[in-house]
Swiss-Prot record:
The gene is cmoA. It catalyses: prephenate + S-adenosyl-L-methionine = carboxy-S-adenosyl-L-methionine + 3-phenylpyruvate + H2O. Pfam families: Methyltransf_25. It comes from the Bacteria. Its EC number is 2.1.3.-. Belongs to the class I-like SAM-binding methyltransferase superfamily. Cx-SAM synthase family. This is Carboxy-S-adenosyl-L-methionine synthase. It comes from Shewanella amazonensis (strain ATCC BAA-1098 / SB2B). GO terms for biological process: tRNA wobble uridine modification. GO terms for molecular function: carboxyl- or carbamoyltransferase activity; S-adenosyl-L-methionine binding. It is an enzyme of class 2 (transferase). InterPro entries: CmoA (IPR005271), Methyltransf_25 (IPR041698), SAM-dependent_MTases_sf (IPR029063). S-adenosyl-L-methionine binds at Y40, G65, C66, S67, D90, N91, D118, I119, N133, R200.
Length: 243
């Protein structure tokens, strides 16, 4: 299924209220995230490369908040012949429907199980890789520690958690600089001032970012002794944590 161009916020007053991963967003999400998140394609490709290095035969992989299935597809392409299973989980039915359609276009011997569920209710077992690709930031902050602790418990020794997030910064000047660079990135990708403003208003109470230090502290408290940044562009970053 092809993705449409993102024009959801192109007209004044469109889609007022909090941002939701509904059918309208699902239809344009592929275009939206590439034009909004610097380095997104690199992150997706590297998720596949990390999977190639860490997914062990017969183990489980969890893609939490799988959206359109980009990470799931990148992983599946790299782990053929390992008898591993991928659980692609999202609480948005429109997203999950499109993810399943997207992956059905490619033949693979790796089983993918699509689950319409709240990732906070997910159990983890025999996991070699868990992916939270721009997902944790949408959970209530009070629920984040518990989820990461459960992920850690379900990972096999040597298993990896890959965590991508939008960051906030303690330094006011640094925050302003990186926000400015990110805005220019979106302008360069064709978003108007109106679109940028309206989406910001819709998402600011839904996406609640943490600092890098908060992420590292949370991962350490969950049990990870090795957790560090592997990618950052402006205020978007990805971390790898190894059990």
């Amino acid at each position: 299924m092809t993705n449409q161009q993102d024009t959801l916020f192109a007209e004044p007053g469109e889609h007022q209220g909090n941002f939701q991963f509904d059918s309208r967003v699902a239809g344009v999400f592929g275009d939206m995230i590439r034009r909004s998140v610097p380095g997104y394609t690199q992150i997706i490709n590297t998720i596949g490369e990390i999977a190639d290095r860490c997914v062990t035969p017969g183990s489980n992989v969890y893609d939490l908040g799988c959206s359109l299935g980009a990470a799931t597809l990148a992983i599946r392409r790299k782990i053929e012949g390992r008898n591993a299973r991928i659980f692609a989980i999202d609480n948005s039915e429109p997203m999950l429907v499109r993810a399943e359609e997207n992956l059905s276009a490619y033949v693979s011997d790796t089983k993918v199980f699509f689950q319409l569920a709240d990732i906070r209710d997910q159990t983890f077992e025999n996991a070699s890789l868990v992916v939270l690709n721009f997902t944790l930031q949408f959970l209530p902050p009070d629920d984040r520690d518990t989820l990461l602790a459960r992920i850690y418990q379900g990972l096999n020794p040597g298993g990896i958690l890959l965590l991508s997030e939008k960051l906030k910064f303690d330094g006011v000047d640094v925050q302003a600089l990186l926000d400015s660079l990110h805005l220019d990135f979106k302008r360069a990708n064709g978003y108007s001032e109106l679109e940028i403003s309206q989406k910001r208003s819709a998402i600011e109470n839904v996406l609640i970012p943490d600092t890098l230090e908060q992420h590292k502290t949370r991962l350490n408290q969950a049990g990870f002794t090795q957790a560090d940044l592997w990618f950052q562009c402006f205020n978007f970053a990805s971390m790898v944590a190894i059990k």
